[in-house]
């Protein structure tokens, strides 16, 4: 069995949630919440996680409008993805992240408000990554096959 390592990102204006998957590519879990500083520092922090986890791909949540269109925030996320692509050597994919933060908040309902604020972004990143992993499994596309395609998908 080949080991799979993919990172999921929930990119916000103040924080970036980071998630990773288990070596089988079945289960995503939160890793860290990066407090945004400046673009260079943000990209360095993500690059650190890519190197540390030996990530083969990065999945970024793309916040579509409820009608499926891309709004200003989605365009900012795509721009961030383009900047990230310039400094890393792994493919980037995008996943519709509508309501991932709402789902994350519900999942953390029993956690104290202070702790929830610290965890919500990484939980949202885990939801984004889990969605990506599940889509590949449902399409009967092994995660490794998806990684081998090495593309940047901005149409999803």
From Swiss-Prot:
Keyword annotations of the record: Cytoplasm, Hydrolase, Nuclease, Ribosome biogenesis
UniProt key word Zinc-finger: no
The EC number(s) this enzyme carries: 3.1.-.-
Organism (species): Gloeobacter violaceus (strain ATCC 29082 / PCC 7421)
GO molecular function: nuclease activity
GO BP, one annotated term: rRNA 5'-end processing
Function: Could be a nuclease involved in processing of the 5'-end of pre-16S rRNA.
Database matches in CDD domains: YqgF
The protein's name in its UniProt record: Putative pre-16S rRNA nuclease
Family according to the record: Belongs to the YqgF nuclease family.
InterPro entries to which the protein is assigned, alphabetical: RNaseH-like_sf (IPR012337), YqgF (IPR005227), YqgF/RNaseH-like_dom (IPR006641), YqgF/RNaseH-like_dom_sf (IPR037027)
NCBIfam families assigned to the protein according to its UniProt record, in alphabetical order: RNAse_H_YqgF
């Amino acid at each position: 069995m080949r080991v799979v390592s993919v990172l999921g990102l929930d990119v916000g204006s103040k924080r970036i949630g980071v998630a990773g998957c288990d070596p089988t590519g079945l289960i995503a879990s939160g890793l860290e919440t990066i407090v945004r500083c400046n673009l260079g520092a943000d990209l360095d922090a993500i690059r650190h996680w890519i190197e540390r986890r030996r990530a083969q791909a990065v999945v970024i949540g793309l916040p579509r409008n409820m009608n499926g269109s891309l709004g200003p925030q989605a365009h900012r996320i795509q721009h961030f993805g383009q900047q990230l692509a310039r400094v890393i050597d792994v493919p980037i994919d995008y996943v519709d992240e509508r309501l991932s933060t709402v789902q994350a908040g519900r999942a953390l309902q029993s956690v104290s408000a202070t702790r929830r604020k610290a965890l919500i972004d990484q939980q949202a990143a885990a939801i984004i990554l889990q969605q990506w992993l599940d889509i590949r499994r449902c399409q009967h596309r092994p995660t490794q096959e998806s990684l081998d395609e090495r593309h940047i998908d901005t149409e999803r």
